[in-house]
């Protein structure tokens, strides 16, 4: 592998600009070589002066890069030292509390089952668990910094070696010895000491001296490009997707030849539509994950996933393919129900019952940690006012806004099975009398409108909670206003529908109000998508017209196509309303909803790419590469004060004025070293050495 590719694959994305600009140096060298005057047409002194002038410029650029790297490394090292002192402080406090309560200095007592612990012991147990996670993330940050150190030194060595080869000189090697090999970022070995001390603390204080268990906890995932999935996972993805495609073709033929034309099919479509949307969402999320990895968007950090254990795009494809097969088989079973002894209404219940069991399965199988993470996140979303809202929380709530049809179809299924289904009839399609009342699919009894508002309500209260935590009216209250427009839209749509059915003369008033609020909501959400969520139309965009100053994805056309797509699908409701109002054929609304629901999932799929890109660029601006985890986090007031200081011109950016404050703060974090630190061992991450000149 060429070193340029190796560097690109192994850098920490959030620190990209702080690495040696290896490609720029290569371009300088090759450009100088191509533009050099030929000895055949000019004298030798002119050639020497040309290369001397170039070398002066080249080494000046090297000095700037070296100064940049030294400064960044020193800042991150100081940050790591402060963080380590804080973690030591918290660990020692936990040990002291435990010593006072139990008289035991080790943590072996916590192995008692959690449900047998007192309230104080439960709190202590959670603190120890949080400390383990905090040390694990801190260790990852140390390895990333050590990787930064090694990659930059290798980059200087490679580019100076290339310089000497092209210019046929040894001044590059001399410059490396004089400047690079004595640079603080290379000579400072404190990072190795911190790594060793962290291993010792985790081994002796948190894992009772079991180094193997400690190192398993601290294990760092491979740094660099996404690792290939296991062969069996790849095989299952191909197998499931292939079977799913074949079954879909079979479904089409079965629908044409087996459906009974004297029965309405809409109960069946409404019941199975939600399952299809969920499968589509999982598959598109797999494409999202693949695209983020390829572009260097660190979604693992953004969602605060465990970097040592999370689902890859292949795992998501596997789950989507497997559920897709079950969905197809269940629907086929409904088509062939007349020749089966099993009642038709059993098949949808079996399908969705299995999906629910797959999610809540308590055994540590079938991606247990990922399922538990999702359940915990869903709990946080539905109890939003009582928790601080993180990115993953409001991201999932946004996904639910695009999957509202699933909730409405779930409500319909419950209502249908409760009130409209004829349980004594087991043949044919799910029975539904076209001439009889069909109130489950209408707004008549009010529940449907409430269910339709649930996703928007979740985001609305999340925005209010974020305003409570930060006291910032913009963007949080303004964002809450955006979601509140959904309440008016749904309310007037329900009033229009019910009044029109009952032939009230004022139904047109509600229709105009419905259209008016649809326009307001679409304009509001469209502007928020493009400007706030995606960060586009930045006045400092420069050559990236109508975009932003920095973009991650390689082609500008992606952004322009996404803007057009978002405009079209945000106003797709105009087609739905136009056709529904002007056409009096039955179930036209169902047909339009069935067509546009997958398109809304696709719109959210595109939205995900640029929303996470914008969040990734925010992390890059803060050089945030790992999760911030603490047993004693800042309270809301302290967090707000810190954010305000960061926004001020004389805040944390002005390091000279606040040096005394930082010094005092670092002093307050000091604590006598734990005894376990004297047993530290060295641990290094080996960076592939690409010495072969052909690979540079």
UniProtKB/Swiss-Prot annotation:
Keyword Transmembrane helix tagged: yes
Biological process, per Gene Ontology: cellular response to phosphate starvation; intracellular phosphate ion homeostasis; phosphate ion transmembrane transport; response to virus
Disulfide bridge positions per record: none
CDD domains assigned to the protein according to its UniProt record, in alphabetical order: SPX_XPR1_like
Domain spans labelled EXS: 439-643
Residues the record lists as Phosphothreonine modifications: 690
Extracellular compartment segments: 260-264, 338-343, 423-429, 504-506, 586-587
Chain spans, region Disordered: 672-696
Domain of life: Eukaryota
Residues at the site labelled Gating residue for phosphate transport: 573
Domain annotation SPX: ranges: 2-224
UniProt note: domains: The SPX domain plays a role in the regulation of phosphate flux. Inositol hexakisphosphate (Ins6P) is bound between two SPX domains of the homodimer. The SPX domain has high affinity for inositol polyphosphates and its affinity for inorganic phosphate is two to three orders of magnitude lower.
Known catalytic reactions: phosphate(in) = phosphate(out)
InterPro entries linked: EXS_C (IPR004342), SPX_dom (IPR004331)
Subcellular location: Cell membrane
Protein's recorded name: Solute carrier family 53 member 1
Task performed by this protein: Inorganic ion transporter that mediates phosphate ion export across plasma membrane. Plays a major role in phosphate homeostasis, preventing intracellular phosphate accumulation and possible calcium phosphate precipitation, ultimately preserving calcium signaling. Binds inositol hexakisphosphate (Ins6P) and similar inositol polyphosphates, such as 5-diphospho-inositol pentakisphosphate (5-InsP7), which are important intracellular signaling molecules involved in regulation of phosphate flux.
Ranges within the bilayer without spanning: 366-383
Membrane topology: Multi-pass membrane protein
Gene Ontology cellular-component terms listed: Golgi apparatus; plasma membrane
